[in-house]
Swiss-Prot record:
GO terms for molecular function: ATP binding; glutaminyl-tRNA synthase (glutamine-hydrolyzing) activity. The lineage of its organism: Bacteria, Pseudomonadati, Pseudomonadota, Alphaproteobacteria, Rickettsiales. This is Glutamyl-tRNA(Gln) amidotransferase subunit A. GO terms for biological process: translation. It comes from the Bacteria. Belongs to the amidase family. GatA subfamily. It catalyses: L-glutamyl-tRNA(Gln) + L-glutamine + ATP + H2O = L-glutaminyl-tRNA(Gln) + L-glutamate + ADP + phosphate + H(+). One of its GO terms (cellular component) is glutamyl-tRNA(Gln) amidotransferase complex. InterPro entries: Amidase (IPR000120), Amidase_CS (IPR020556), Amidase_dom (IPR023631), AS_sf (IPR036928), GatA (IPR004412). It holds the Pfam family Amidase. Heterotrimer of A, B and C subunits. Its EC number is 6.3.5.7. The active site is at residues 78, 158, 182. Keywords: ATP-binding, Ligase, Nucleotide-binding, Protein biosynthesis.
Length: 493
């Protein structure tokens, strides 16, 4: 029998319903795995007592034949989802001992469906980063290793802890957040399905903000079916979030295994020109095009002329919003406060923020403050907003001809810890292919589609029309079926 912690969400639900094992046994299998792989630093707060208590309640519900859709399923939450009575830090010193007195809407939705929380996962500080190296709790190590080298690799970011937890069989599924690629890029680096729904599908209430017009909750799973199950539980209108979309939660599970006949898939191959993409990624892209063609889809060559400006636009808009959002951390109401005798209020602000924020967060606050200053507002911020609209228009034009768009999730395979972190510009380019869809607020997923020559997983990104999570899952499921001969499992786990 498969080890319990290696079961998918769907298989776990089936096993629990059939009384093959209990939720308590399932949770204990995950706890054992977490204890065994603490060196990966995937979790920053463990909630094992809570998980076992929730598992007991789940077992009672199964005994009475009254289970919810996620009854007894162990999941992890990125440490920017507020959890009532449980430390929530966004992996920043400024919030290191913050304990919220309310629950985020997304975690509440999962609890309402019977989910069992194992703990809070590590992340880049305030979700700013793409390698999970800016956390105040230290970096996360990927469960994966290259076949020609034993060096520690990054899991991607900013949701690196969630990616490592699911990839290393330390959670059945894990919540992440995606602002410019923080679910899709780590999913690509760790061989997982990472899904970011349409902006507004999941409530942002109770999520620690980075860039409010871009932030969206997402999910990591080990199968596309699991992704559809988790999304149905997470999504839904919430009056506590003014950007929440008032739309029914669609049925998504029937998308799995659906026919690709008559589907048109857009491929913007011109975005891969100029040597930005590693050859292995280019090969995966071409192989996936053939796979979808053989499955009955029509491949359409498209262009997204303004997508190449995506990174520049993102690194004006996101820091601008962050500099505003992060102004609330001042040492007055909650979080860290640095004090000394006879200091003024301004000195307290200055010392608290200097001690509380890490280098990358300070860098982005300064960029944001600069682009919002009166002398730069027109030249940077307003111009970036105009180009953002052009990026969205490109997608609208493309979707007049196609049902979904195919792009790699990342231009490279996972790299070594410390390899690129001294050059912020190179780090920012990790999100080259994920940012455009974020700027347009579109649903998108990364699905494992191949291995590099060094045996590392590579993810293919599928982008859909607004509110069309169904077709994204349909394409992702077809790709998943086409590569089922490949084992996307790290060695030694």
């Amino acid at each position: 029998m498969t080890e319990l912690n290696k079961l998918t969400v769907a298989d776990s639900v089936k096993g629990l319903k059939n009384k093959d094992f209990t939720s308590k046994e399932l949770v204990n299998a995950h706890i054992k795995q977490i204890e065994k792989h603490k060196n990966l630093n995937a979790y920053v707060t463990e909630t094992f007592d809570l998980a076992l208590k929730q598992a007991e309640a789940a077992d009672q519900n199964y005994a009475q034949n009254q289970p919810q859709t996620l009854e007894g399923i162990p999941f992890a939450a990125k440490d920017l989802f507020c959890t009532k009575g449980i430390r929530t830090t966004a992996c920043s010193n400024i919030l290191k001992n913050f304990i919220p007195n309310y629950e985020s809407s997304v975690t509440q939705n999962i609890f309402d469906k019977g989910g069992v929380m194992l703990g809070k996962t590590n992340m880049d500080e305030f979700a700013m980063g793409s390698a999970n190296i800016t956390s105040c709790f230290g970096n996360v190590i990927s469960p994966w290793k290259a076949n020609d080298d034993n060096a520690d690799l990054v899991p991607g970011g900013s949701s690196g802890g969630s990616a490592a937890a699911v990839s290393g069989f330390m959670a059945s599924a894990a919540l992440g957040s995606d602002t410019g690629g923080s679910v899709r890029q780590p999913a690509s680096f760790t061989g997982l399905v990472g899904f970011k729904p349409t902006y507004g599908r999941c409530s942002r209430y109770g999520m620690v903000s980075f860039a409010s017009s871009l932030d969206q909750a997402g999910i990591f799973t080990r199968s596309v079916l699991d992704s559809s199950i988790m999304l149905e539980a997470m999504m839904g209108f919430d009056e506590k979030d003014s950007t929440s979309i008032k739309a029914e939660v669609p049925e998504l599970q029937s998308a799995i295994g659906s026919s690709m006949k008559n589907m048109k898939i857009g491929v913007p191959l011109s975005l891969g020109e100029g040597g930005i993409i590693e050859p292995d990624i280019m090969k995966m892209w071409q192989d996936t095009i053939e796979l979808l063609k053989n499955a009955g889809a029509e491949i359409v060559d498209i262009t997204l002329p303004h997508a190449k400006y995506g990174v520049a636009v993102y690194y004006v808009i996101a820091p601008a919003e962050a500099s505003s959002n992060l102004s609330r951390y001042d040492g007055v109401r909650y979080g860290l406060r640095v004090e000394r005798e006879n200091m003024t209020l301004d000195e307290m602000y200055e010392m608290t923020r200097s001690a509380g924020f890490g280098e990358e967060v300070k860098r982005r606050i300064m960029i944001g403050t600069y682009v919002l200053s009166s002398s730069c507002m027109d030249a940077y911020y307003l111009k970036a907003q105009k180009v953002r609209r052009l990026v969205a228009n490109d997608f609208n034009n493309a979707f007049a001809k196609v049902d979904a768009i195919l792009l790699p999730a990342a231009p490279t395979e996972a790299f070594k810890i410390g390899e690129k972190q001294n050059d912020p510009t190179i780090m920012y380019l990790n999100d080259l292919f994920t940012i455009p869809a974020s700027l347009a607020g579109l649903p998108c997923a990364s699905v494992p589609a191949g291995l590099s020559a060094r045996g590392l997983p590579l993810g293919m990104q599928i982008i859909g029309k607004q509110l069309d999570e169904y077709n994204v899952l349909k394409v992702a499921s077809t790709i998943e079926s086409g590569v089922k001969h490949i084992k996307f499992e790290p060695k030694g786990f």
